[in-house]
Amino acid sequence: MYEGIVQDLIDELGRLPGIGPKSAQRIAFHLLAADPVDVRRLATALTEVKEKVQFCRSCFNVAQSELCRICSDPRRDPSSICVVEEPKDVVAIERTREFRGRYHVLGGAINPIGGVGPDDLHIRELVARLADGTVTELILATDPNTEGEVTASYLARQIAPMGLKVTRLASGLPMGGDLEWADEVTLGRAFEGRRVVSA
């Protein structure tokens, strides 16, 4: 244990995902030794991201205005929506340059054990987006793990009465993995080989 504010910093850093006690300590001491200008720049970036970043009113991706840059881009194909769990998944798919449609970020996956049900996700908003008839294909790009599969199956059943083409990314993604860790080639091939999902 360190004194006062040093320990407070270590404790706060340790609350971040993927940062254990040792990493938190290393980061804290790096910040203590860093140039004050660099530390102020980091503090400003943290403050600004909380003050200026919001969620897109259409797709729930991160945005600095009402619509994210993808939803406001007229070159994107409005007839195809790719459903992902988190904004980081949008970034992973965008890196492939395979998809030119729009996205819908659910904000997680169905996980009854974790207390996350369909009503806790942006599923109602997705159904509302599909109601106007513009969308012809819905691509389910949830993570290839149990929660992602449950979520994809639930969505396929909910969307089936609308008569849309519903596809799922092809295999090649490891079961139990996360989209954000897939390389561009694997994710691109999964996109190319997506399969139709039946309810």
From Swiss-Prot:
Native source species: Frankia casuarinae (strain DSM 45818 / CECT 9043 / HFP020203 / CcI3)
Annotated PANTHER family: RECOMBINATION PROTEIN RECR
Domain Toprim: 79-174
Molecular-function GO terms, alphabetical: DNA binding; zinc ion binding
Alphabetical UniProt keywords: DNA damage, DNA recombination, DNA repair, Metal-binding, Zinc, Zinc-finger
Family designation: Belongs to the RecR family.
Zinc finger (C4-type): 56-71
Example GO BP: DNA recombination
Protein's UniProt name: Recombination protein RecR
Role, per record: May play a role in DNA repair. It seems to be involved in an RecBC-independent recombinational process of DNA repair. It may act with RecF and RecO.
Encoding gene, per UniProt annotation: recR
PROSITE patterns with a match to the protein in the record: RECR, TOPRIM
Keyword Transport annotated: no
Pfam family membership, one: RecR_HhH
Superkingdom of origin: Bacteria
InterPro entries the UniProt entry points to: DNA_Rcmb_RecR (IPR000093), Hlx-hairpin-Hlx_DNA-bd_motif (IPR003583), Rcmb_RecR (IPR023627), Rcmb_RecR_Znf (IPR015967), TOPRIM_dom (IPR006171), TOPRIM_RecR (IPR034137)
